[in-house]
Amino acid sequence: MSVKNRSVRLLILTASATAMLLPGASLAQAEAIKKAPAGNAFYKASAKQIKAGKPGTIIWARQVKYTANGRVALASASKTMLVLYRSLDPKGKPIAVSGMVDLPKGKAPKGGFKSISWAHGTTGAADICAPSRDVAGGPADSYITYATASYNRWLKAGYAVFRTDYPGLGVKEPPHPYLIGVSEGRSVVDITLAARELYPKLSKDYLIGGHSQGGQGGLFAGSLAPKLAPKLNMKGVFSYAPASHLYEQGNAVSNLGDDFKGLTALVMMILNSAMHEARVQPSTLVTPQIEALLPKIEEVCLAQLTGDDIFGNIAPNAILKPGVTTASIDAVLKAMNPNVKIKAPVLIAQGLDDTTVFPSFTAALVAELKTSGDKVTYDTFPGLTHSGVVTDPAASAVVLDWIKARLR
């Protein structure tokens, strides 16, 4: 074989391998996806790379192989891709967001696989708390893996699954805008666009789902979807125990004493996010003890924040300085409430034994959504807790039936 022929053959093999990495993509599209760096360098794109495309486009991607003790690739997926894609922060600045794209096994139906874009529950606010960075025994492992059975169930039913990390998780900057619904929601929609850059033959029909923080973020995503992804068909939103009424809850929690120290870490994640959003200097609002601990929110995950060496030994009524006013913070907390207008059907599932997202607040949210004209189905489950509403087989079956009805 001549040198010229060998060179041509090598080019063909290289192009074929690239195309095989991205099933359903043309050769030109496959070549346009930049090869991702290995290790944690995956999460570090330059400002130039981030600004080189529109929100919802891919910076780079790489395949993650399934292993029995792994956390990122799913057992029921034919392929899991780790993706870094473009989005915007709450102020409209271009940012990179990480996430995962899972394809089901088997041949795609006519029109392509329909899909679910998932918004996860609270793991923390540090970059290491991202689901895509999870490992067995990791700092947020138990806050992530409870939903794995749901992902596999959806894949087995024939749906592709997209799992954003959210801004500021995985990628270090910007700080994670915890419960800032527009930011979370945008990242949930943008990954649906990014997935279709990888796999253009995916169906345009998709659902948005989420739990807790993600239940709230998913509702915001549902309201944003028609504008952010007008060429796709968002067929509905299913939301497990969505966080809501943070302003009302903040007023109640701020007066709680030592018996409620276990709430302080979560309260501080919310307050820290609100201070960032409102551009309030912590020294004007919180006690010196609390201010000294704030950097920990960007260093460790929720499970560690609840420890006695951080927030676990501080009562909620010891967070704020005496006599401070919080008007700008209150405005942010009110804006976190997901009483949004969604044109597609909505399912809200709530465990009645939930002591994290209280059923009374969820019932109030459902009433607000219905008043706005949203088509809401509200299913409650006696005896189920905050995580139980996601993991319980009976509740899961109800939600899966709803999913199948929307994605027929």
Tell me what each language-model feature is:
Residues 246, 352-357:
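Acidic catalytic loop of the alpha/beta-hydrolase fold
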Residues 178-198:
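Alpha/beta-hydrolase active-site loop
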Residues 342, 347-354:
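Short beta-strand/loop motif that positions the catalytic acidic residue
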Residues 193-199, 203-262:
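Primarily recognizes the serine-hydrolase "nucleophile elbow" in alpha/beta-hydrolase
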Residues 29-108, 370:
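Catalytic-loop region of hydrolases
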Residues 330-331, 363-364, 370-408:
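C-terminal catalytic histidine-bearing segment of alpha/beta-hydrolase fold enzymes
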Residues 90-98, 102-157:
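Short, surface-exposed "cap/lid" segments of acyl-processing enzymes
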Residues 47, 243-339:
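Accessory cap/linker subdomain of secreted extracellular hydrolases
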